[in-house]
Amino acid sequence: MKIRNSLKSLLGRHRDNRLVRRKGRVYIINKTQKRYKARQG
């Protein structure tokens, strides 16, 4: 999992990327390409 300050640029890298909020953190998850998983931090 990548940890980035800004997720906006990562969101457009793959069409299956989804932005989700869990426990006060912002994540990008991708069911088809797991390598695009990221967390804002």
Swiss-Prot record:
Keyword Nucleus: no
Single GO MF descriptor: structural constituent of ribosome
Pfam short name (any one): Ribosomal_L36
GO cellular component, one term: ribonucleoprotein complex
GO biological process, one term: translation
Domain of life: Bacteria
Residues of the signal peptide: none
Alphabetic keyword roster: Ribonucleoprotein, Ribosomal protein
UniProt entry tagged with the keyword Ribosomal protein: yes
InterPro entries: Ribosomal_bL36, Ribosomal_bL36_sp, Ribosomal_L36_bact
Recorded family membership: Belongs to the bacterial ribosomal protein bL36 family.
Alphabetical list of NCBIfam families matching this protein: PRK00831.1, rpmJ_bact
Listed PANTHER family: 50S RIBOSOMAL PROTEIN L36 2, LARGE RIBOSOMAL SUBUNIT PROTEIN BL36B
Protein's recorded name: Large ribosomal subunit protein bL36
Species of origin: Xanthobacter autotrophicus (strain ATCC BAA-1158 / Py2)
